[in-house]
Each structure stands twice: as structure tokens, then as C-alpha cells.
Regions:
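Flexible, glycine/threonine-enriched loop-and-boundary segments that flank and lead into catalytic domains
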Residues: 1-14
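Short, active-site-adjacent cap segments at secondary-structure transitions
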Residues: 6, 33, 107
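Hydrophobic/aromatic-rich, well-ordered segments within soluble, folded domains that form packed cores
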Residues: 15-21
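Acidic, two-metal ion nucleic-acid-processing modules in DNA metabolism proteins
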Residues: 18, 39-231
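A short linear hydrophobic-aromatic micro-motif
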Residues: 23-26, 56-57
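Short glycine-cluster motifs
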Residues: 25-40
Length: 231
């Protein structure tokens, strides 16, 4: 992509990988030759696959999940063809997967739970943050926040309780709307955003967190995935 600067190639590759759950390489024009960044999924060792194509590359380096590379213009199509021919990914491996620690009804979300989770930090590749799931929660209202309109604040009521809690879903790819439209139509989506659709049910994957605003401390959920269902 001649319009993308090499400094943001990794960000673009990461977003495309997240949206489509596919290994992704973004090439930019570069100063002397095309340069690129690669981002991968757990099932595809990007560094190993690029190593099989090192005769086509000027330079490359990285690890299974990410890499950087440079190559001549005439080798771009050759690299694409060889990577695709060598790819052994199955349809099952391309299904996005989120591993949860356990199902946790929202009535068990507490300040103590958040403190206990924070005591396990720092989180990273070898020590992932715990993720929980709950089914059939009720979304009373949704608010769209942020300069880019990509943060969804959900007012959630658990099925077994009248205690409400806010949930935040950060979305840079349009996934929230895409997921909603698997069950409802465009008109319903607009009504949902306007707050006139009524209660919506969903299953969520989340982790509990604390929100501090104007001296007030409240519990909130950070939602990592959502699946809407009909009432």
C-alpha cells in the first residue's frame, strides 16, 4: 500500500488480523524497497513460514505471532503465491477462539474479585488476564462514546438480579454492529442505539474492572466478545 506509512503497518496488519482472524502482511512502499509488518494467529507460525521464503526476502525477523520484512518489488507476487501454497490452515483452525476461565454469573462480580484478579498481574502472553462468560444477560440501553464512535457502553441487568452494571465494548472494526445484524435488521440497530428498541438479550465474555469518575468508584465489565440473541 503506497498510502500507508511503514510506521503504522503493524497497527494496520493487527487490525485486519483481528477482524478476519487470518495471518496478515501489510507492505508499504518504503524508502528504498517495500517494507512490511506481519501479524499472525496462534495456529500459524509467521516466522517459520517466512523462513521458508527467505530466498525471496531482503531482510526479515520476528517470532511466531509477528514479524517485519523487506523485499524487492518483483518478489511481492512470488512471496504471496508461495505463502498461500504452503499454508496448511484448516477451516476449523480459522474459527476465532476465545478461551474463558469459567462461567461467572454477574451477581458474583465484586470489588474483592477485581482486587484478587489484579493481584495476579502483570498479565501478558504467558499469564493472560482471566476471562469469564455469562449467558442471557439483559441490555437495557446502549450508548456510543468516543471521538471515533467506537466505544459502546452497555447498561446491563443480570437475569437473576435488578442490580445494574455498565459494560464497555471497544470496537475498531465494526464487529458490534456486524454481530447485532446476525440476529436483527438495520432498523432495529438504529432503534437500539436510540434507546427505543427495549431489552436485548446477549451472551458475553468479559472481565470485571473498576471505573473511577469524579470521585465515584463503581464496578464495570470490559466485554471482550458478545453474541446477541432474540428475546
Amino acid at each position: 500500500d503506497e498510502e500507508t506509512h511503514e510506521s503504522v503497518a503493524g497497527i494496520v496488519a493487527g487490525r485486519i488480523k483481528e477482524k478476519y482472524n487470518l495471518p496478515t502482511i501489510i507492505l508499504t512502499k518504503g524508502k528504498d524497497m517495500p517494507k512490511g509488518s506481519a501479524r499472525s494467529i496462534d495456529e500459524y507460525n509467521m516466522f517459520e513460514e517466512l523462513s521458508k521464503c527467505k530466498d525471496l526476502l531482503d531482510k526479515f525477523g520476528g517470532h511466531p505471532m509477528a514479524a517485519g520484512l523487506s523485499l524487492s518489488f518483483e518478489n511481492i507476487d512470488k512471496l504471496r503465491q508461495r505463502l498461500n501454497e504452503n499454508c496448511k490452515l484448516t477451516e476449523e483452525e480459522l474459527i476465532p477462539k476465545i478461551r474463558i476461565d469459567q462461567r461467572l454469573p454477574l451477581k458474583y462480580v465484586s470489588f474483592k474479585l477485581v482486587d484478587d484478579i489484579k493481584s495476579l498481574e502483570p498479565f501478558g502472553k504467558g499469564n493472560p488476564s482471566p476471562l469469564f462468560a455469562e449467558k442471557d444477560i439483559i441490555i437495557e440501553r446502549v450508548y456510543v462514546l468516543g471521538k471515533e464512535k467506537n466505544v459502546f457502553k452497555l447498561l446491563i441487568r443480570p437475569e437473576e438480579s435488578y442490580n445494574k452494571i455498565n459494560g464497555l465494548f471497544f470496537d475498531s472494526t465494526g464487529y458490534f454492529k456486524e454481530t447485532f445484524l446476525r440476529v436483527y435488521d438495520e432498523v432495529s440497530y438504529e432503534k437500539f442505539l436510540e434507546g427505543v428498541l427495549g431489552d436485548i438479550r446477549a451472551d458475553i465474555i468479559y472481565y470485571p474492572d473498576i471505573n473511577e469518575y469524579n470521585g465515584t468508584i463503581t464496578l464495570q465489565l470490559v466485554i471482550k466478545d458478545i453474541r446477541f440473541s432474540t428475546n
